[in-house]
Amino acid sequence: MSEESNDDKKPTTKFELERETELRFEVEASQSVQLELLAGMAEIFGTELTRNKKFTFDAGAKVAVFTWHGCSLQLSGRTEVAYVSKDTPMLLYLNTHTALEQMRRQAEKEEERGPRVMVVGPTDVGKSTVCRLLLNYAVRLGRRPTYVELDVGQGSVSIPGTMGALYIERPADVEEGFSIQAPLVYHFGSTTPGTNIKLYNKITSRLADVFNQRCEVNRRASVSGCVINTCGWVKGYGYQALVHAASAFEVDVVVVLDQERLYNELKRDLPHFVRTVLLPKSGGVVERSKDFRRECRDERIREYFYGFRGCFYPHAFNVKFSDVKIYKVGAPTIPDSCLPLGMSQEDNQLKLVPVTPGRDMVHHLLSVSTAEGTEENLSETSVAGFIVVTSVDVEHQVFTVLSPAPRPLPKNFLLIMDIRFMDLK
């Protein structure tokens, strides 16, 4: 590390990294930091950096820049922390990628399907990062893996409160992440699987079915396999949901991060042909507070409407109550004795409940279903996009929405989320 200079009033620091080390830094609140690779080669979560190009990271970003052979880096701006570490599990992650690539080559040779990998672990162990890494390494070798997002709290394929899949055709952008051109997205409606575990498992199965259908007609997708990101709920129903996902996708490999107990439980409960691997989390992984998670969710939703760093201009328009049908998936829990004969609480969890538009809808997100009619089973139909209700005029029977596309709405079936978004910026 070299001395700091105050170029353009921003502190600038140079770092000389030895082979197989990484620079870790976190960006201060309300600040941004620029990173530049001056010499050598380096990567961020499997995406190679271009030399002499400045990459900008905004407030709250937590970044690890790794080098296999050594490099020179320059940071400009105020960081909360910035240090070089030799203690990194990257070699273990690379070995995992190499083993998966061998499975893909074997699948090509024997005309079988490629590896289906599920990454599991408690919260804040770096599951999303490992997924990104494995996907980037695969696509850099010419593969076309599918990224499956089962973490409803994060929504990296779409927005929080959804589950989805994305066909990866190029490495993730250093700043923006994976290019989200045509994701397959399903409405869940909450940031916690426990709010409706029956629906969560049903959508997991639906995603697996659609992925299998794609693999039947797309040989490259089949050989490349998939990488499945999961949520950090690993006990009780959360654990059962992991076992269900492994079964639905017929996974070949489960990567367990940082929890020996979970590793042993899965080894015991999954079929013997599933390879279960225990890997350490990176020392750079930091614990995220509830406030930070909420801010990240809000930022993700804001990005959906306004684009990365505000490059889009969303549309505001009125929607008549009579033009749409709004539903919530899952009826409130009632005592078993009050349920109709032959009906269980589980049936109740998948029930479509009509929602009458009212002022309590303000700030709620609505998923625009691709369904043509309710007989299509709205809970298992993908969504075209999302709108947020900004105001409701009960007297004139209209509500105003913020939408990424101009009027009219593509379909008239809407599913309401528990998630709210207040457009304050």
Swiss-Prot record:
User: What if the gene is knocked out?
Assistant: Early embryonic lethality.
InterPro entries, alphabetically?
Clp1 (IPR028606), Clp1/Grc3 (IPR045116), Clp1_C (IPR010655), Clp1_C_sf (IPR038238), Clp1_N (IPR032324), Clp1_N_sf (IPR038239), CLP1_P (IPR032319), P-loop_NTPase (IPR027417)
* Organism domain of life: Eukaryota
Q: What EC numbers are recorded for this enzyme? A: 2.7.1.78
Question: Which keywords accompany this UniProt record?
Answer: ATP-binding, Kinase, Magnesium, Manganese, mRNA processing, Neurodegeneration, Nickel, Nucleotide-binding, Nucleus, Transferase, tRNA processing
**Which family does the record assign?**
Belongs to the Clp1 family. Clp1 subfamily.
Q: What name does this protein carry?
A: Polyribonucleotide 5'-hydroxyl-kinase Clp1
Q: Which organism is it from?
A: Mus musculus
What does the record give as the organism's lineage? Eukaryota, Metazoa, Chordata, Craniata, Vertebrata
